[in-house]
């Protein structure tokens, strides 16, 4: 045994050998192992008469001997093994070469290939007819936004939809929702990737890895998208699925000698049969024995690898034709490879045709998501991998469950063919087997609970149970496999294309996935009752009854109808297939721009019926995923949309829902609207009722509120975890169905939409609990679970548990959204399931949640219940200022919620580290009608926060409210809620940023929101449902306050520091109203529409034009944000959108005509239009006051728009973003001009606008901020004034906090900021925010697109790749000139607020960094000018 002292002595001996005397002395004195030596050490450092060796050998000798030994061990053994292997390999290769070299062999091979192909086709037809087991799976990788990070494998739950009319082809429909961590964009793009375009192509791809001909088959099945996908796909998930298939096949082959023999025969036939020459026969004689043994056994590779494609195909065909291999083919779904070929062929030939039930776009289908086209290329390749991997698993499952596969009806296919031409290649057509007409397998990454994607909306209850049984089994295997993969993929709540299940059995279930060119255009139109696909332009209002949600927003929205049927089978029970009708309007901005009218809102509202899929949501939960920006805009439209959600939910719930769970309970009251913002922040929305009472939960829930915690979809294990919980839950009774409106969006406008949607729903008579969530786009992995307690529509001020009469029913009524973190999720989901009925389950996996279930309040209209739930993973991250009563943070623990006493506790943001028990009065400031603003769990909203969601709960009245332990904070929402404002945290820089409220209502400081877009959007979401066009118009002060972020003002008053209060005004819902309010408001509203953000209107009406423009800009930026995430990362894009929104709003405020022009431009997203609008702004006499600012804004917007537009052109929805940016820039410019003369550079303008936002908003706060946004306009105004001054410094801090990299970015930009700082300090915060956002966006865009360290380079490349129109160049030149002109003014501003400017520049860079179609070069030019 070697002791430490032995080592020390050896070292000492070495030192003495080297005569290192001083080192020896030091070593002896310091070494604890030589203490005894120290007593006898001489001055020279030597120990006399001491043998410093081990076994007579010193250190050098020992080491030399050791090295010699090791070299002997390692060197001798390798050559023998390697040489033998190499010899065998050489031998087999030489044989193959000689064989292939013979011309006769080649000729015969071709003939064999032709005949074999023909034979294979015949056999496939027969097999498909005889074996419906080969399920059609279409791989639809879902690319979320950009792939800022190599997307975790998009979870693909591929469930055989049923065979296509061509029985021979089995397609796997795999919807991959991959999302980058930060670029989680909801349903940004759906890629339909052929499993294998051609057998040969697959063979070539797979040949290197083929082990057997069966494995070849498998491989071929995977290979088509496989090769491209592998780059992006999570290697583990893909490997797992592929390995499963290969292992199964391998086991079968190894266990069956006859199969091995036949395989060898088939191989030898082709290797030998063509060799008629003497040499060839000799070789062939060897081949059967040697090649097979040498290659297959030693190398584990089939000899075919070295054969030509034709030879491989021949062998494969021969094998397939052999009935003995039928089981193997079933394993791999041998038809899959054929189907893949057919799919690619049929898709290419008939993208819209019905015969391929699926229309596959090119593997580059990602082009579908136009706004993220740059990302599309990355995402596409990544997605196909998902498809392939899922295909493998699915084929196995499908084959195993062959009885489940039904032949898809031609009708369905035909219906699919209806998909719009623009979507043709991008359209995902899935015909469900007639039996399962409504059954669809969708991987809905954003909704972990929906993760099973055994979402078969069986239009018929009959079909549902039956299909549920059939598919449950398949799903059990498939889901498990797919879930394994799904959990890897990060997907926003973009639902994969899922088939809509026509309510009528007659109508084949057609899932329409329209992928618009625009980033937000990706439309998943799943029409349930109406099999027809609604055109993107068609508005929901027009077709309220039709499931195809808002077609107008379809471009911007992904419409997803996922039907999970109650778990009839054990697997299905796991999945608890919930019929989920999810219309996800990813591009909230696009939606806003598209649906400036209520139609937008309608389209935004997505009906989602979630029946304990993933969650043990025992009952159907109709979740409308949508930004529902304008949901309240038009009562009729809203009613239509509500009706759609409501009616479709009911009809589909009842019809599509498993017969077990009729959706009768899913009535308007019961419908749950889950609005997932354009950002994929809420990638996964898992509705997990307590497992114990899954059915009961849903049942009691519908009338009552549901508490759901929503986590990001990123937690990969969550899917699997969710599944088990769903397994626990039993079928969901129709009575168990709970209807909630869950709005998950990073965009502030979405939050406004929630209010609008609630108002609309109330108008429609659809009192649905509304949950407004900000999706955690920035740190999807960190995404805190958003816990939402939804009070029932009619229960006013009643907590969810209070609403539920029975404790058991309450437990049942609780829907817990699992947080995406898989590990925490699982435990908490189970725990959440265990939640007692008395407690609204606040399930926080990563962090505390704030579950605020506001009581219905008149402010919100009929849909009174608004729940804002926030999950803060790292409460400590919150600043101490957040610790004020304003912010309530529910500390989250990995431990089950039931076990934890913490969930009941409300912990103020970590800074204060104070914990409020839910029972205790959280804050004297909280009033029953309190507004709760939840910042998104994006990247640290506050500097100290990491992926936490600051939640500020502000009560207008200041009444204390206590929440019973374990209950979510029950915040009765009154008008103050509508006036959502995040109280300014005592730490203005951080908490304010976290709030994302930059005095938003009056001070369009939504740059913060941009940074925190997801969180801000939550704040914005803070139930502006009440705000309706009419309400906004009539009660500018009041409802604008309410709908816009007035509450911050009022709420802020109760808050500790009014100056810190930043009001988040999301006027998207109020855009029309704002127009009515006044020209400025009209402009703002128009801009809002353009930006697809209605919030600006509210902002403008609430505050004077100067203040309003910044708010509008911020809002618009937030609105733009959803498109940007598609382009970049969600959060980044959200930021840029917010900035652009603000700019746009300010521009809009400049003049109504300009607004109209800008809105038009936004719609067109043409730089020329933007230039025209800018010119008009300059020309318009109305702009005389703000002309300079407007011009600056116009220039900025032009430049931004130009950059954005180029980006937009690349990414379908960019155009909206560009317009938004330009408008926001204009707004900021207007503000700037108020303070100073017009500046020309867009970047300068943007910076100035940002500064303007901060300073102008402050000024406006002092003057306009008191605007009636908040019901208590007077107090709000005073508070606003305070916040203006205070916000100046904090805003930059907030911005830095808001942007994940804001802090870092600020210092680099400081030199640039002075030159481009706005004329007044008012814009300093905005400028900082803009700069920070821009930098973040650029960096994230670069990361997501190319994962390279040079985001600008990547963006530049992308921009260059996209054709730059000469008009854009001209516009850029004009903008540059203008920017130069504005330089002096910006410099003046910089003198006043350089620090703010730095931050602003950073933010500015982020939002303007290629928000959508922005040219990198142009963008850089503008930045340089600003610098």
Curated annotation (Swiss-Prot):
The modification Phosphothreonine is found at residues 1270, 1350. One of its GO terms (molecular function) is transcription coregulator activity. This is Protein NPAT. Changing residue 1100 to A: Impairs activation of histone gene transcription. GO terms for cellular component: Cajal body; cytoplasm; Gemini of Cajal bodies; nucleoplasm; nucleus. PANTHER family: PROTEIN NPAT. Residues 1140-1151, 1276-1285, 1371-1382 have a biased composition (Basic and acidic residues). The lineage of its organism: Eukaryota, Metazoa, Chordata, Craniata, Vertebrata. PROSITE patterns: LISH (PS50896). Its main location: nucleus. Residues 1396-1406 have a biased composition (Basic residues). It is found in: Nucleus; Nucleus, Cajal body. The modification Phosphoserine is found at residues 207, 554, 599, 775, 779, 1100, 1151, 1200, 1254. Changing residue 7 to A: Impairs activation of histone gene transcription. Changing residue 27 to A: Impairs activation of histone gene transcription. Residues 199-231, 628-669, 683-732, 1095-1121, 1133-1152, 1253-1327, 1348-1413 are annotated as: Disordered. Phosphorylated at Ser-775, Ser-779, Ser-1100, Thr-1270 and Thr-1350 by CCNE1/CDK2 at G1-S transition and until prophase, which promotes association with histone gene clusters and stimulates activation of histone transcription. Also phosphorylated by CCNA1/CDK2 in vitro.
């Amino acid at each position: 045994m070697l002791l430490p002292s032995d080592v020390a002595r050896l070292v000492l001996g070495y030192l003495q050998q080297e005569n290192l005397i001083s080192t020896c002395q030091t070593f002896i004195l310091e070494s604890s192992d030589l203490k005894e030596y120290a007593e006898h050490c001489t001055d020279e450092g030597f120990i006399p008469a001491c043998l410093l060796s081990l076994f007579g050998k010193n250190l050098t000798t020992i080491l030399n001997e050791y090295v010699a030994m090791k070299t002997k061990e390692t060197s001798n053994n390798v050559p023998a093994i390697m040489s033998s292997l190499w010899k065998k390999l050489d031998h087999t290769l030489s044989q193959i070469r000689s064989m292939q070299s013979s011309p006769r062999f080649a000729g015969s091979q071709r003939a064999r290939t032709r005949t074999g192909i023909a034979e294979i086709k015949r056999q496939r037809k027969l097999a498909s007819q005889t074996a419906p087991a080969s399920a059609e799976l279409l791989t639809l990788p879902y690319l979320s936004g950009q792939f800022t990070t190599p997307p975790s494998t998009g979870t693909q739950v591929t469930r055989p939809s049923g065979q296509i009319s061509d029985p021979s082809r089995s397609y796997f429909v795999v919807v991959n929702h991959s999302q980058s961590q930060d670029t989680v964009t909801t349903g940004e793009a759906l890629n339909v990737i052929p499993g294998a375009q051609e057998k040969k192509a697959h063979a070539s791809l797979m040949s290197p890895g083929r082990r057997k001909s069966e494995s070849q088959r498998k491989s071929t099945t995977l290979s088509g998208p496989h090769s491209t996908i592998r780059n992006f796909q999570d290697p583990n998930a893909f490997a797992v699925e592929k390995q499963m298939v290969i292992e199964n096949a391998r086991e079968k082959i190894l266990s069956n000698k006859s199969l091995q023999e036949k395989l060898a025969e088939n191989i030898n036939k082709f290797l030998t049969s063509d060799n008629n020459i003497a040499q060839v026969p000799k070789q062939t004689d060897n081949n059967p024995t040697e090649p097979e043994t040498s290659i297959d056994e030693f190398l584990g590779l089939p000899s075919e690898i070295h054969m030509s494609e034709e030879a491989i195909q021949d062998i494969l065909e021969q094998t397939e034709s052999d009935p003995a291999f039928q089981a193997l083919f079933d394993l791999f779904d041998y038809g899959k490879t054929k189907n893949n070929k057919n799919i690619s062929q049929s898709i290419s030939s008939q993208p819209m045709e019905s015969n391929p039930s699926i229309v596959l776009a090119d593997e580059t289908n990602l082009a579908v998501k136009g706004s993220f086209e740059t990302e599309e290329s990355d995402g596409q390749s990544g997605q196909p991998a998902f498809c392939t991997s899922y295909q493998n698993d699915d084929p196995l499952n499908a084959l195993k469950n062959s009885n489940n596969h039904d032949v898809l009806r031609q009708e369905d296919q035909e219906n699919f063919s209806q998909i719009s031409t623009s979507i043709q290649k991008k359209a995902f057509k899935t015909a469900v087997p007639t039996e399962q007409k409504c059954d669809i397998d969708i991987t809905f990454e954003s909704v972990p609970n929906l993760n099973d994607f055994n979402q078969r909306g069986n239009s018929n209850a009959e079909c549902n149970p039956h299909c549920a049984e059939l598919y449950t089994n398949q799903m059990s295997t498939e889901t498990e496999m797919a879930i394994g993969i799904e959990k890897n993929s990060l997907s926003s709540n973009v639902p994969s294309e899922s088939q809509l299940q026509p309510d009528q059995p007659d109508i084949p279930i057609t899932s329409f996935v329209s992928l618009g060119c625009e980033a937000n255009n990706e439309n998943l139109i799943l029409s349930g009752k109406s099999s027809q696909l609604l055109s993107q332009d068609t508005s929901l209002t027009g077709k309220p009854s039709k499931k195809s949600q808002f077609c107008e927003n379809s471009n911007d929205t992904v419409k997803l109808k996922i039907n999970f049927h109650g778990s009839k089978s054990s697997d299905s029970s796991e999945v608890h297939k919930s019929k989920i009708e999810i219309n996800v309007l990813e591009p909230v901005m696009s939606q806003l721009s598209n649906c400036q009218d209520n139609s937008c809102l309608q389209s935004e509202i997505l009906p989602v019926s979630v029946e304990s899929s993933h969650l043990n949501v025992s009952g159907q939960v109709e979740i409308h995923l949508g930004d529902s920006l304008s949901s309240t805009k038009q009562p009729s439209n809203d009613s239509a949309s509500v009706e759609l959600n409501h009616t479709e939910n009911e009809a589909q719930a009842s019809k599509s829902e498993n017969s077990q769970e009729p959706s009768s309970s899913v009535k308007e009251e019961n419908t749950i609207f889950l609005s997932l913002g354009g950002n994929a922040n809420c990638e996964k929305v898992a509705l997990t009722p307590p497992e114990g009472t899954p059915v009961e939960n849903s049942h009691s829930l519908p009338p009552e509120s549901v508490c759901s915690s929503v986590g990001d979809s990123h937690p990969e294990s969550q899917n699997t975890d969710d599944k088990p919980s769903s397994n626990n839950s039993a079928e969901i009774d129709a009575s168990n169905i709970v209807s909630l409106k869950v709005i998950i969006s990073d965009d502030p406008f979405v939050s406004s939409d929630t209010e609008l949607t609630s108002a609309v729903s109330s108008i429609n008579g659809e009192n649905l609990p509304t949950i407004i969530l900000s999706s955690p786009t920035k740190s999807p992995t960190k995404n805190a679970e958003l816990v939402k307690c939804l009070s029932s529509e009619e229960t006013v001020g009643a907590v969810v548990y209070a609403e539920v009469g029975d404790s058991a029913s309450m437990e049942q009524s609780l829907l817990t959204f699992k947080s995406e973190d898989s590990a925490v999720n699982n435990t908490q989901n189970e725990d959440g399931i265990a939640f007692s009925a008395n407690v609204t389950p606040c399930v926080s996996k990563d962090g505390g949640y704030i579950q605020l279930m506001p009581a219905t309040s008149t402010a919100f209209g009929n849909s009174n219940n608004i729940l804002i739930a926030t999950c803060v993973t790292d409460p400590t991250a919150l600043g101490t200022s957040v610790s004020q009563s304003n912010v309530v943070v529910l500390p989250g623990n990995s431990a089950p919620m039931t076990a934890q006493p913490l969930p009941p506790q409300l912990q103020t943001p970590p800074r204060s580290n104070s914990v409020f028990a839910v029972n205790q009065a959280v804050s004297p400031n909280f009033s029953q009608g309190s507004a709760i603003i939840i910042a998104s769990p994006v990247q640290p909203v506050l500097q100290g926060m990491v992926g936490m969601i600051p939640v500020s709960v502000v009560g207008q009245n200041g009444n204390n409210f206590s929440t019973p332990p374990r209950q979510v904070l029950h915040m009765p929402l009154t008008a103050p809620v509508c006036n959502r404002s995040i109280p300014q945290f005592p730490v203005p820089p951080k908490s304010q940023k976290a709030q994302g409220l930059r005095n938003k209502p009056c001070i369009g400081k939504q740059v913060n929101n941009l940074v925190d877009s997801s969180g801000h959007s939550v704040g914005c979401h803070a139930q502006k449902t009440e705000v309706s066009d009419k309400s906004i118009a009539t009660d500018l002060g009041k409802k604008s306050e309410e709908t816009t972020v007035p509450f911050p003002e009022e709420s802020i008053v109760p808050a500790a520091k009014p100056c810190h209060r930043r009001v988040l005004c999301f006027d998207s819902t109020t855009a029309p109203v704002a127009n009515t309010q006044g020209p400025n408001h009209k402009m703002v509203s128009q801009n809002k529409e353009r930006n697809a953000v209605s919030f600006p209107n509210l902002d403008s009406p609430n505050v004077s034009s100067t203040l309003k423009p910044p708010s509008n800009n911020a809002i618009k930026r937030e609105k733009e944000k959803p498109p940007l995430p598609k382009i970049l990362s969600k959060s980044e894009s959200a930021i840029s959108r917010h900035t652009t929104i603000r700019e746009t709003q300010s521009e809009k405020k400049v003049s109504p005509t300009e607004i109209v022009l800008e809105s038009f431009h936004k719609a067109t997203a043409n730089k020329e239009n933007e230039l025209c609008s800018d010119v008009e702004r300059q020309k318009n006499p109305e702009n005389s006051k703000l002309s300079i600012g407007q011009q600056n804004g116009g220039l900025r917007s032009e430049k931004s728009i130009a950059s954005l537009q180029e980006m937009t052109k690349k990414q379908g929805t960019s155009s909206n973003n560009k317009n938004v940016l330009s408008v926001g820039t204009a707004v900021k410019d207007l503000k700037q001009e108020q303070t100073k003369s017009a500046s020309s550079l867009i970047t300068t303008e943007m910076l100035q606008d940002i500064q303007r936002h901060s300073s102008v908003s402050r000024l406006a706060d002092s003057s306009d901020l008191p605007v009636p946004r908040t019901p208590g306009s007077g107090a709000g105004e005073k508070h606003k004034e305070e916040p203006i001054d205070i916000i100046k410094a904090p805003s930059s801090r907030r911005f830095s906090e808001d942007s994940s990299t804001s802090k870092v970015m600020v210092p680099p930009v400081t030199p640039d900021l002075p030159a481009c700082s706005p004329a007044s300090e008012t814009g300093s915060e905005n400028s900082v925010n803009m700069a920070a956002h821009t930098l973040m966006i650029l960096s994230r865009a670069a990361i997501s697109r190319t994962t390279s360290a040079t985001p600008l380079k990547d963006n530049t490349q992308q921009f260059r790749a996209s054709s730059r129109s000469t008009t854009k160049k001209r516009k850029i030149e004009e903008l540059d000139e203008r920017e130069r002109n504005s330089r002096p003014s910006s410099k003046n501003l910089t003198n006043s607020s350089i620090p703010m400017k730095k931050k602003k520049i950073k933010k500015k860079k982020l939002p303007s960094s290629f928000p959508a179609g922005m040219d990198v070069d142009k963008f850089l030019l503008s930045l340089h000018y600003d610098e």
